[in-house]
């Protein structure tokens, strides 16, 4: 579980709600019609903008913020070194059925065992990365739509409230409360976009970039094995993807 994501999102919500309570209670900040305009209105617009599978799938994608896939770069380097040594000793066929960390690595290894040449191997795996990025970007686009449309729907709700307020100016005492209700939709739109969806989008983009880096590292290692390069050379090439601290730790091991 991504503790930072959970603490950050929960902490931001607690701070906002806490300030409302401190200012006099949550009740003045709750208005059901305003919530419907912002949340339901934004949801329907996002649905209109995106294909149904993407709209339904992006909710599941957002849950990955709290439980993302983890990619251990050190593990994949160590595994690649072992496979390289085995391939140089017993041949490529000796790699068949060997345990690897994930499905992408397994597919690449199977292509290698099946005798796929280096160029075709790289092309196929690069296509896999391209397809993955397209899926991720589709879901991220749906999340971004919430960020873009939410505040706009908040403004729409505020304008509706102002029209209703200005249409009933006979009672001056009602103007203040009516104005407050009108402004709530703007508040809801800003909170939804910046407190909830913006951090989620940023996390998803980061996780996607990490997965691309991991997969490119796998390709680099498999390419080295296909070329018959030494395990040391493959390791030196792959270690470049690690940060300085991890490089030093691996060198000392």
Curated annotation (Swiss-Prot):
The chain crosses the membrane at residues 3-23, 29-49, 146-166, 181-201. GO terms for biological process: bacterial-type flagellum-dependent swarming motility; chemotaxis; proton transmembrane transport. The keyword Transmembrane helix applies. Keywords: Cell inner membrane, Cell membrane, Chemotaxis, Flagellar rotation, Hydrogen ion transport, Ion transport, Membrane, Transmembrane, Transmembrane helix, Transport. It is a multi-pass membrane protein. PANTHER family: CHEMOTAXIS PROTEIN MOTA, MOTILITY PROTEIN A. This is Motility protein A.
């Amino acid at each position: 579980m991504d503790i930072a994501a959970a603490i950050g999102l929960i902490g931001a919500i607690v701070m906002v709600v806490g300030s409302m309570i401190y200012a006099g209670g949550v009740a003045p900040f709750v208005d059901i019609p305003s919530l419907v305009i912002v949340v339901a209105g934004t949801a329907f617009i996002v649905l209109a903008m995106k294909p149904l599978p993407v709209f339904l799938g992006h909710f599941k994608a957002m849950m990955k913020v709290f439980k993302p896939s983890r990619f251990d770069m050190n593990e994949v380097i160590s595994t690649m070194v072992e496979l390289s040594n085995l391939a140089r000793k017993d041949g490529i066929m000796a790699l068949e059925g060997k345990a690897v960390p994930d499905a992408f690595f397994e597919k690449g290894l199977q292509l290698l065992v099946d005798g796929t040449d280096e160029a075709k191997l790289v092309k196929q795996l690069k296509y896999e990365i391209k397809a993955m990025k397209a899926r991720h970007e589709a879901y991220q686009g749906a999340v971004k739509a919430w960020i873009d449309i939410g505040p706009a729907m908040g403004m729409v709700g505020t304008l509706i409230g102002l029209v209703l307020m200005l249409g009933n100016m006979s009672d001056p005492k009602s103007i203040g409360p009516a104005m407050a209700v009108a402004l709530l939709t703007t508040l809801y739109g800003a909170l939804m976009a910046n407190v909830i969806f913006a951090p989620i989008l940023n996390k998803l983009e980061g996780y996607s970039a990490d997965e691309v880096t991991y997969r490119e590292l796998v390709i680099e290692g498999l390419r080295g094995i296909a070329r018959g390069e030494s395990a040391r050379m493959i390791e030196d090439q792959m270690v470049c993807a690690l940060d300085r601290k991890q490089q030093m730790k691996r060198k000392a091991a």
